[in-house]
């Protein structure tokens, strides 16, 4: 299950003007056909490896399909789509829905989140704690790890977490995330942290802007190897 970041799930070319999300209304530019390159790429990646990818739209369903720009965390308009108390409920609803689908193995459902969605994923893992009926694991890309983003600065989760960070992230602090991970591991959680030298925020965005940085390109290629290894490596 995929959790988009603060920009929302749609292409930046259309999302700024989106007030409506619809599959059937031609005036709605934001729909499954206008996902960002990153979300489309990862959805196809999981399909190619035999997994179903579900991408809930936390923002469009609440009239905020346009998403939010950089450094807007304190914007009051984000309160009702926040990553601590609102978006984890979206993840819980998605888990319940996936388990109702006959073609889905309900014991092998995983989380992948980016930035704000990565923070959401960490909060989901904190909320479910030692529960055996929750998500099996989480792949977390460059999350915000400060107190404003996380429910706790020590995450207690029995499910494994893989955290992928860029050393040159210009939006969030990789050092803060490493500190959170270190405390969490000391408390018994299973968190693997990878910091990519020279990589920035959004290092896995396949667009030319991000991939023109060789460090981002190398990070993306490594992340795609690690992602399937982390998930396939879990025992049923």
Task: Tell me what each language-model feature is.
Residues 5-66, 147-148, 170-173:
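Short substrate-entry loop that stabilizes the transition state in hydrolases
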Residues 103-115:
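Alpha/beta-hydrolase fold nucleophile elbow
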Residues 1-5, 165-166:
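The conserved beta1-alpha1 loop
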Residues 131-145:
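A conserved short beta-strand
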Residues 38-42, 67, 74-102:
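Alpha/beta-hydrolase active-site loop
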Residues 118-130:
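Short glycine-enriched nucleophile-adjacent loop
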Residues 190-236:
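C-terminal catalytic histidine-bearing segment of alpha/beta-hydrolase fold enzymes
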Residues 157, 163-165, 169:
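Short beta-strand/loop motif that positions the catalytic acidic residue
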